[in-house]
Amino acid sequence: MKDRIYVCHTYYHAYVAFLKELALPREKRGQATLLLSSMSNHFEDFGERAFSTGLFEEVLPFDEKREDFFPELAKYRVDKGNIVFNMWQRIKFTRRYAKLEAPYVPVDFKQYGEVYVFCDSDPIGYYLNQNKIRYHALEDGLNCLVHFDAARYDNRGHFGLKAFLSSKLNLIFVQNGYGKYCLDMEVNDIGAIQMPCPKYRELPRKQLVDRLTQEDKDIILQAFVRDMDGLKEKIDQCNQVSEDGKTTPKILILTDPLCTLDVREKIFRDIVETYEKQGQIFIKPHPRDELDYSKVFPGYPMFDGTMPMEMLNFFEGLRFDIVVTVFTDLKGITFADKLVRLGDEFMDKYEDPMIHNQNKRIGILEKEDETISKQ
């Protein structure tokens, strides 16, 4: 029997896995498996860097497959006209999907004492529940359930029935704490979630970060920063002071993988145009953003897109006057005086509001335009 395994789909997931391992007593570290799914993220050589830290016993790739990889599943998604027939279709889909995914699962999860899964809405959630493997779920992104309750949105209309069929009978699968074999789901802030699942339990990310030693931070940076010299060069640019002793306000723009590439380019051109009047612009692409910002904005300092933004918290003296984003939750940032999350109302100008106003469509209202001042 092995100790524990983390199933990660993004760099942020892996970052939280590092935080959780570093929170353990030193003698218990180095005994976990880090499983990196390539379904929605290309980890490049991150696995090698993560393994080199010695924090994990093994780091393995996971060739997880989306449902459209299996053409035979499409017939189960056809609307049959009423909830009874549609639910029967969904039951068959759930069982079949788990069986089709099985050959691509590289480990025997039953050999692990603890299984931790980020984003169990992905195929791994179907596989674990249909194979009766108990696991701990973790939120996909910081406070992601505050901004988008995916379980309720994806299952709007008779949600209570669908949650029952999943959590009690395991006939279908509903993510984010409603799976029968999901033991619990770890979130950053339960109080901010308007309709929490009974299985949610709170573990603030700040609590994990605040306990890090400098040695711990160095381990994280070793894994997540592939070009330390390049990163330090950007930080030096940010800290530059003019000859008269004055500093130009520094503004960091965090991108998001929004819309189509052409619309996304317009969005961030508009954001840059708005904020470049206030100071010097720096850009940090999202790890899953495929737009080449170095070509769109060749004159602006650019941080490595594969690096989680949280890495910048570990450099003392680094300070931005403003950090701006569209949808990324900024509450984990400590290196800025003002944090601006533009939100849904901003996005209404660029796409049909029905596309991104998911919470509103299920009766959850949130503050659209969020500005936080750090003291």
Task: Say what each PLM segment does.
Residues 7-177, 314, 326-332:
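Active-site and donor-binding regions of nucleotide-sugar-utilizing enzymes
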Residues 39-47, 124-125, 145-146, 260-262, ...:
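Short, charged/polar "capping" segments at the starts of alpha-helices
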Residues 355-375:
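Leloir-type glycosyltransferase catalytic cores
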